[in-house]
A protein has these predicted regions:
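Rieske [2Fe-2S] iron-sulfur domain-containing proteins
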Residues: 1-3, 24
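Glycine-enriched catalytic-core subsegment of oxygenase/oxidase enzymes
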Residues: 146-148
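Single conserved hydrophobic/aromatic residue that forms the stacking wall/gate
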Residues: 150-157
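Non-catalytic accessory segments flanking enzyme active sites
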Residues: 14-55
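Conserved beta-strand positions that form and line the central face of beta-propeller blades
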Residues: 38, 83, 157
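Short, contiguous pre-domain boundary segments
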Residues: 3-15
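Rieske [2Fe-2S] iron-sulfur-binding domain
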Residues: 45-144
Length: 157
């Protein structure tokens, strides 16, 4: 693609297909879903305990637990697939608005109404899936694939 040019006067705009073609959009979302994505700044979690974000089309949330550790977990309830939060919150737990499942800030299921007597409950599959997260000078990056572990960060002067 001949769009980027070191001299701004010779640069071109992106072809319109980048804004209109559904197949290209889906292809780009897929590519972005397999790499590190910016999901927020650490300062966003000074007044909140959770902030929602998207990696591709995948709803995630960035949390900061009681010890100040950052986590990136799924923002979709493991029970019925409900999105858990639409905006920043400042709660010690994450509660599903559908059936009331409650998770801690690491994504571990803490409570499900009327399931106190259920056998073999909860199991690990009831917890919110965790994603990798890295903090680089306050910039928070996360990725979906568990197998993708290396984040190359620029060096600072």
């Amino acid at each position: 693609m001949d769009v980027i040019h070191p001299e701004i006067a010779k640069a071109k705009t992106l072809p319109s297909k980048y804004y209109t073609e559904e197949s290209l959009y889906k292809s780009l979302l897929e590519k972005f879903s397999t790499t590190w994505n910016f999901v927020g700044h650490a300062s966003m979690l000074e007044q909140s305990t959770t902030i929602p974000a998207l990696i591709g089309n995948n709803p995630v949330m960035v949390t900061k637990d009681e010890l100040g550790k950052f986590h990136c977990i799924s923002n979709v309830c493991t029970h019925r697939g409900m999105v858990l939060t639409e905006g920043p919150t400042n709660q010690r737990t994450i509660k599903c608005p559908y059936h009331g499942r409650t998770f801690n800030l690491c994504g571990k299921l803490k409570h499900m109404p009327e399931f106190e007597q259920a056998e073999n409950f909860p199991s690990a599959s009831d917890d919110l899936p965790s994603k990798k997260i890295k903090n680089w000078h306050g910039l928070l990056f996360a990725n979906l694939p568990v197998s993708y572990t290396h984040l190359t960060l620029p060096t600072t002067a």
